[in-house]
Curated annotation (Swiss-Prot):
This is Uncharacterized protein VP5.
Length: 647
C-alpha cells in the first residue's frame, strides 16, 4: 500500500475530485494561498505489478524529489515532497518510483492543476515539467509492456520486461559513446559514423509519447500572430527532407529557448488546421537524453498573410548541435537562429552550420555565478518573437535596424539592437560611402548613442550583461569610434595606439575574442578562432570593418591586429599591461599559408607570425635602435623602443 497526493486549484472552493476504481478513505488537508485554495488529498492505493521495471528510471527520481522539496512554494510543505526526499535519502528508489507511478498517471487532477499553479508562482513551472516528463515515461513503459505482451505476438509479460530492459541497456551504451565524443574538444573531435547513427537511432525509436502542452502565459498569448499548438511526434527523416525546421524541448532542469525562422515561409490557408498538417512541414520529433524523455513545446507564429514565419524552440545548444549535425549544410544556412541564451565557449564553438545568431536576455533572471549567462524567461522570449513577427521577416533577414517596442528598462532592448548592428553578416549593410579616415564609424557611433540612451555607460558594460565578458572584467570607458590622426606618428603607430586604447578602455581582450568567434560563425557557418573582418568597399574606398570592436581599417595589413588579439586570448598570452587573459577557447588548426593565423608564442611575436611587426624596422627608423632584432621582437623590448605604444 502507498499514498498519493492530488493537488487541486480553485478560486473560491475546492474542486470535487472523482477517483474511479479506487476504494479507500480520503484524508483532506487545505492550504490557503493569496490567490487560490490548494486542497491536498491523500489516497491509499494499491501498487501495480508493473512497477518492477521502473527501477530503470531511478536516476530521474532524485531530480523530481529535489525539485518538489526545494522549490520555494507551498508544494514543499506537502507530504509527498517529504516522503520522496526520505525515500531518496535512504536509497529506496523502487519505493519512490512506485509512489510517483501511483501519483502521476492515474490522477490527471494534479497535472491539470499545475499550469494554473505555475501562473500563480513561476517556481512551479519546473515542477510541472518534471511531473509531466515523468508521467510520460511511466505511461510509455506501461504501453510498451502491454504491446510486447500482446497474446497475438506470443510474448508473455516476463519476456516483455526483459526485451524492454535489453533495449534500454543498448540505448544507454549508445548514449555513453555519444557523450564520450561530445566531451572531446571540437578541435580534436572526429565524429564517428557509428556514434552519429546511434544518436539518431536511439533518440526517438521506441521511446516516444505525446504529452499535452501547458497553456501560454498572459504576457504573450494575446498576440494575434502568435499561436500555440499541441505537439505530435514524427520521424527524423521528415526533418531531413523538408526545408523548414526542427522543434524540440530539452532538459527541463536547464531550459533554454531558440527561435527558428525560415527564409521560405509556409503558405497556410487555415490557421485552425490540425497538428498533423503542421508536423508534415515542420518535422517535429522527440528528443531522448539519458533516462529523461522530454515532451515538445512549440509556438508557431504567422504573418498577416497567414504564413508561418517562425517557431519557438526550447532546448539546449548541445542538443541543437547533435540534431543539426546530420542535416544538409545548404538547409542550415537558410535559417535564422535567435538564441535566448548566451552560449558558453564550448557551446559556441560547437554550434553547427549557419544562419544569423542574436542573443537576448531577461534582466530579471538571477545571475548565480559571474561565469553563467543570464537565462531568459519563456515570456521574454515569446514577447521578442511576437515583436519580430510584427516587424516582418524581410527586415530581420536584411539586417536593417529594428526598433523593438519593449518594456522600459528592459536590458534586452539595448542588447538586441547592439547585436543587430554588429553581428549580422549581410554585405549590403556594410556598403558605405567614402568618408575621411578620422570620421567616427557610423555603426560604432550608433551603438554608443543607443546604449547611452538606455542607461549604459559603454559597450563593455552592455556586453557583460549577456556573458560576452566575465563580471570581473567590466570596464567603465567608451570605445573609440575611429582611429584618430595623431600628429607625428606614422599610420601603423596610430593603429597600435588605437588598439591599445581600445583593448584597455573598451571591449576587453576576452570580449573581443568572443565577438570575433561569433563573427566567424556567422560569416562562414563554422566558428573561427580569428575575427572575420567585414569588407567595406565602394568605387573609391576599400576598408575592413571589425565586427568585434567596431574599428575600420584601410588595409588588410592593419586588420590583422584584431587577429593578434584573438590569438593572444586563444593561447592565454599575457599582455604587458599586466592583464593575463584566461580564455577557454580551443584553437583550431592554423593555416600555415596565412601569416595571421600562425601561433603567437607567449612574450614573443615571431617574424612570420605578424608581418606588421616584422616591418617595424622600416616604419620606425628613428624610434628603433639599429641593433634591434625584429625577428625576435618581444612585447617589453618593443614597448621600450617605441615609448610604450605597445598593447
Amino acid at each position: 500500500m502507498s499514498y498519493i497526493t492530488i493537488i487541486v486549484i480553485s478560486s473560491d472552493r475546492p474542486t470535487p475530485i472523482h477517483l474511479s476504481g479506487i476504494h479507500s478513505s480520503c484524508e483532506v488537508q487545505s492550504y490557503t494561498s493569496v490567490r487560490s485554495t490548494v486542497s491536498v488529498h491523500h489516497q491509499e492505493v494499491e501498487a501495480r505489478p508493473d512497477c518492477q521495471i521502473k527501477s530503470q528510471y531511478s536516476d530521474v527520481v532524485p531530480i523530481i524529489a529535489n525539485s518538489l522539496a526545494e522549490d520555494n512554494c507551498n508544494l514543499m510543505h506537502d507530504r509527498i515532497a517529504y516522503q520522496l526526499s526520505e525515500l531518496c535519502a535512504s536509497k529506496r528508489l523502487d519505493e519512490c518510483i512506485t509512489k510517483l507511478a501511483d501519483l502521476v498517471p492515474r490522477h490527471i487532477d494534479l497535472l491539470s492543476a499545475m499550469p494554473t499553479l505555475a501562473n500563480l508562482n513561476p517556481s512551479f513551472q519546473r515542477v510541472h515539467e518534471l511531473l509531466m516528463d515523468y508521467s510520460g515515461q511511466i505511461m510509455h513503459v506501461q504501453q510498451t509492456i502491454s504491446n510486447l505482451a500482446n497474446p497475438s505476438k506470443h510474448v508473455d509479460f516476463n519476456t516483455a520486461v526483459e526485451i524492454l530492459k535489453s533495449r534500454m541497456v543498448e540505448r544507454e551504451n549508445a548514449i555513453e559513446r555519444i557523450q564520450a565524443i561530445e566531451s572531446v574538444p571540437l578541435s580534436h573531435r572526429v565524429m564517428e559514423g557509428t556514434a552519429r547513427h546511434d544518436l539518431m537511432k536511439y533518440k526517438h525509436a521506441d521511446f516516444r509519447v505525446t504529452l499535452p502542452f501547458s497553456a501560454p502565459t498572459s504576457d504573450w498569448s494575446s498576440t494575434e500572430e502568435l499561436r500555440s499548438d499541441v505537439h505530435l511526434v514524427s520521424d527524423v527523416n521528415t526533418c531531413r527532407n523538408t526545408d523548414y525546421g526542427v522543434i524540440y524541448k530539452a532538459n527541463p532542469t536547464h531550459v533554454e529557448h531558440v527561435i527558428w525562422m525560415s527564409r521560405q515561409p509556409l503558405q497556410i490557408v487555415d490557421k485552425s488546421m490540425t497538428d498533423t498538417y503542421f508536423d508534415e512541414y515542420l518535422g517535429a520529433f522527440r528528443i531522448i537524453c539519458g533516462d529523461n524523455v522530454f515532451h515538445l513545446h512549440r509556438h508557431v507564429a504567422y504573418n498577416q498573410n497567414s504564413q508561418v514565419i517562425g517557431v519557438v524552440l526550447e532546448g539546449s545548444p548541445y542538443l541543437l548541435r547533435a540534431i543539426f549535425r546530420d542535416l544538409p549544410r545548404t538547409l542550415m544556412t537558410s535559417f535564422v537562429f535567435l538564441t535566448a541564451v548566451t552560449p558558453l565557449p564550448d557551446q559556441l564553438l560547437s554550434f553547427p552550420y549557419g544562419g544569423y545568431i542574436h542573443t537576448i536576455v531577461d534582466s530579471t533572471a538571477p545571475l548565480s555565478h559571474p561565469l553563467h549567462p543570464l537565462t531568459p524567461s519563456a515570456e521574454t522570449v515569446c514577447f521578442y518573437f511576437s515583436q519580430l513577427c510584427h516587424m516582418g521577416r524581410e527586415h530581420i533577414l536584411s539586417g536593417e535596424e529594428i526598433e523593438c517596442v519593449l518594456p522600459s528598462g528592459e536590458v534586452s532592448t539595448a542588447l538586441y539592437r547592439l547585436l543587430t548592428l554588429i553581428n549580422l553578416d549581410d554585405s549590403k549593410r556594410y556598403v558605405m560611402t567614402k568618408r575621411p579616415y578620422n570620421v567616427p564609424n557610423p555603426v560604432r557611433h550608433t551603438i554608443d548613442v543607443f546604449l547611452h540612451d538606455h542607461g549604459f555607460h559603454d559597450v563593455a558594460d552592455a556586453l557583460s550583461e549577456i556573458g560576452y565578458m566575465y563580471a570581473t572584467q567590466k570596464i567603465s570607458c567608451l570605445l573609440p569610434t575611429a582611429i584618430t590622426d595623431i600628429e607625428g606618428i606614422s599610420p601603423l603607430a596610430q593603429v597600435l595606439l588605437s588598439l591599445r586604447v581600445r583593448c584597455k578602455n573598451g571591449v576587453t581582450k576576452f570580449g573581443h575574442t568572443r565577438l570575433g568567434q561569433m563573427s566567424g560563425l556567422c560569416k562562414h557557418g563554422t566558428p573561427r578562432n580569428i575575427t572575420q573582418m567585414m569588407f567595406i568597399s565602394d568605387d573609391q574606398t576599400t576598408e575592413f570593418f571589425c565586427p568585434a570592436c567596431g574599428t575600420v581599417y584601410e588595409t588588410a595589413f592593419e586588420r590583422q591586429l584584431c587577429n593578434v588579439i584573438d590569438y593572444m586570448c586563444v593561447y592565454n598570452v599575457p599582455f604587458d599591461d599586466g592583464i593575463f587573459v584566461m580564455s577557454p577557447y580551443y584553437a583550431l588548426n592554423p593555416k600555415k599559408s596565412d601569416p595571421s593565423t600562425l601561433k603567437i608564442v607567449s612574450s614573443n611575436i615571431g617574424y612570420g607570425a605578424y608581418p606588421g611587426i616584422a616591418m617595424l624596422g622600416e616604419c620606425y627608423d628613428a624610434a628603433i635602435p639599429p641593433d634591434f632584432d625584429t625577428k625576435t621582437l618581444s612585447f617589453a623590448r618593443f614597448r621600450r623602443a617605441t615609448g610604450g605604444m605597445m598593447l
